[in-house]
């Protein structure tokens, strides 16, 4: 998945780090540390040397309770810093909620507009429409001055996800390309500690929307409460751990104060893999309840997937019922796709999957024939192989409706490790037509 930011293009399947450069006197964790021009430039270049791909320049504090500053004051802090960094060949993001400031900084060379207000201002949308900068669309309930005044949600994950989906769709309707948009659920912005924690533990719901997504938890107050760390400067290690967790759930951009600590944590990021599950023989089912029996067997297999060492299920698709493919004289199938993070190598993973199939009575007599449970590796991150034991990506993914639909449900626009888009075969040309249950 690429994030297009003016002349910069980032493949965010492997997370990248955006270094935070606050040129303010009053930011919550580093206000005043880099608010002279020379200090700001030096710190930005240091973060680039440490491995940051983007520098996010902010000239207005958005900490809870902060007062708005004038655009003139904001630009006096930011625009020359943006200009010098951009001229040095650095990808610069401007962290602003003011259209006039965004326009001036884009003209000075900024390649990204990071708007904590989520492009609610029509003037900001017009700035975005008139340039080719990448956009960070954030969720914030209320305004910085009042956002922490008892925020209430019926379901914080659903409300934030749906808000971001709506804002992204509106931006696309305004003429902004899909691949310019990055979504940020806004941890700590109009959310208390427990709400933010719930949101971060369900980050895959944001990733499901099919856009690049950002985790911006660095030194946030919820980390202080969750880990018992009062001083924001002491939260870098915990922040990096939270960022790693979000990246395992699908985040592709990490906004961080401490670039070195963050990249150190991201070394532990496990590859993702997609598994396809299918069943059309129910071992135990009353007449008329065969579908429920098939679902029960797939659920049992998913339970066993949870037991594979150094692995974690990230997401599971809905169940789909599909027509038989290739060998037609058999019962309909129930299918699903599972997204996992795993430290287990593909060949070893295949052995675990065969053991799960065998435990559920899998008999391999007829090619593409009836089965109690089938668990296939569909795609394994950055891994392409074709030998007698294993072929990856699975060679028939794109022609199988019963794989394409559940996979795209959890990972819209997914591109396989060999560069093939999952949706490359039109639906009317696929086999095994599938319907969501």
Name each model feature, range by range.
Residues 61-66, 314-341:
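Short, charge-patterned binding micro-sites
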Residues 48-49, 90, 167-180:
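Phosphate/pyrophosphate-binding loops at sites that engage ATP/ADP/AMP, CoA/4′-phosphopantetheine
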Residues 5, 29-38, 42-43, 62-84, ...:
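Active-site-adjacent loop and "lid" segments of alpha/beta metabolic enzymes
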Residues 271-311, 317-321:
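N-terminal beta1-alpha1 ligand-phosphate binding loop
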């Amino acid at each position: 998945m690429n994030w297009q930011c003016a002349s910069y293009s980032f493949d965010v399947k492997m997370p990248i780090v955006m270094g935070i450069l606050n040129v303010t006197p009053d930011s919550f964790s580093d206000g005043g540390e880099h608010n002279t021009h020379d200090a700001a430039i030096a710190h930005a270049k240091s973060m680039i040397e440490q491995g940051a791909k983007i520098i996010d320049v902010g000239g207005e504090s958005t900490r809870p309770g902060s007062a708005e500053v004038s655009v003139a004051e904001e630009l006096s802090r930011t625009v020359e810093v943006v200009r010098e960094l951009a001229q040095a060949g650095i990808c610069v993001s401007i962290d602003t909620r003011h259209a006039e400031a965004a326009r001036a900084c884009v003209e000075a060379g900024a390649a990204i507009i990071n708007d904590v207000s989520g492009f609610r201002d029509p003037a900001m949308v017009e700035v975005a429409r008139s340039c080719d900068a990448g956009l960070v669309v954030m969720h914030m309930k209320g305004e910085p001055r009042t956002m922490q005044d008892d925020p209430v949600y019926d379901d914080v994950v659903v409300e934030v996800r749906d808000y971001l989906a709506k804002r992204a769709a509106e931006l696309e309707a305004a003429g902004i390309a899909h691949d310019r948009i990055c979504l940020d659920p806004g941890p700590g912005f109009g959310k208390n500690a427990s709400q933010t924690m719930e949101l971060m533990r369900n980050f895959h719901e944001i990733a499901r929307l099919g856009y690049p997504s950002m985790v911006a938890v660095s030194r946030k107050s919820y980390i202080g409460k969750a880990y018992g760390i009062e001083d924001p400067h002491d939260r870098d290690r915990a922040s990096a751990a939270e960022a790693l967790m979000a990246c395992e759930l699908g985040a592709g951009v990490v906004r961080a104060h401490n670039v070195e600590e963050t990249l150190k944590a991201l070394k532990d990021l496990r590859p993702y893999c997609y598994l396809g599950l299918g069943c059309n023989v129910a071992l135990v089912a009353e007449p008329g309840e065969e579908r429920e029996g098939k679902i029960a067997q797939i659920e049992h297999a998913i339970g066993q997937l949870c037991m594979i060492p150094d692995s974690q299920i990230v997401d599971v698709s809905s169940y789909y019922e599909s027509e038989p493919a290739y060998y037609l004289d058999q019962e309909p199938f129930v299918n699903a796709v599972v997204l996992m993070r795993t430290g287990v190598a593909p060949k070893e993973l295949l052995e675990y999957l065969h053991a799960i199939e065998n435990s559920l009575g899998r008999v391999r007599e007829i090619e593409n024939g009836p089965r109690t449970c089938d668990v296939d590796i569909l795609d394994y991150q950055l891994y392409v192989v074709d030998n007698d034991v294993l072929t990856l990506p699975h060679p028939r993914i794109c022609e199988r409706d019963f794989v394409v639909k559940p996979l795209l449900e959890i990972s819209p626009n997914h591109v396989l490790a060999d560069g093939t888009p999952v949706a490359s075969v039109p639906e009317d040309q696929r086999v095994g037509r599938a319907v969501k249950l």
